[in-house]
Every structure is written in C-alpha cells, then in structure tokens.
C-alpha cells in the first residue's frame, strides 16, 4: 500500500513537471517585454539633463521633509 502511494505521488509530480513551463533565467527581455527589447546598451543611456532634474526633484522633496520635521518638532516643544 505504501509503495503504491509513493508511486502515485511520483507520477503526479512527473505529470505536474511535464505540463508546467518555467523560465529559470530572468532577464529584462523575458516574457511579453521581449517583443520590443532594446539593444544591449540602450537601456543604460540617460541624458544628463534628465538625471539632474530627477536629482533636483529629490533634493527638493528631502528639503520639504526636513522643513516639515523641523516645524513639527518646534511646534511640539
């Protein structure tokens, strides 16, 4: 009885493995995104102006958080 249960479990596992598909290596070009995949070096190119505007926006938000924290601590004391 135990041998039969192990055999049935093995068959179920083999059928599950045979009917499923998996991709073991995940890259930026897997799945539906692969249709319009950029060339090898395209995904790392960014203009300096775009990077500077992102940096400036982040710095402005950090400054707002600092000011808000300072205002809150002054109001509580």
Curated annotation (Swiss-Prot):
Family recorded in the similarity comment: Belongs to the AKH/HRTH/RPCH family.
Lineage: Eukaryota, Metazoa, Ecdysozoa, Arthropoda, Hexapoda
Main localisation: secreted
Cellular component aspect of the GO annotation: extracellular region
Molecular-function annotations in GO: hormone activity
Role, per record: This hormone, released from cells in the corpora cardiaca, causes release of diglycerides from the fat body and stimulation of muscles to use these diglycerides as an energy source during energy-demanding processes.
InterPro entries noted in UniProt: Adipokinetic_hormone_CS, AKH/RPCH_hormone
Signal peptide: 1-22
Organism: Locusta migratoria (Migratory locust)
GO-annotated biological processes: flight behavior; neuropeptide signaling pathway
Residues found modified as Pyrrolidone carboxylic acid: 23
Keywords per UniProt: Amidation, Cleavage on pair of basic residues, Flight, Hormone, Neuropeptide, Pyrrolidone carboxylic acid, Secreted, Signal
Superkingdom assignment: Eukaryota
Subcellular location: Secreted
Residues carrying Tryptophan amide: 30
PROSITE patterns: AKH (PS00256)
Pfam families: Adipokin_hormo
Name of protein: Adipokinetic prohormone type 3
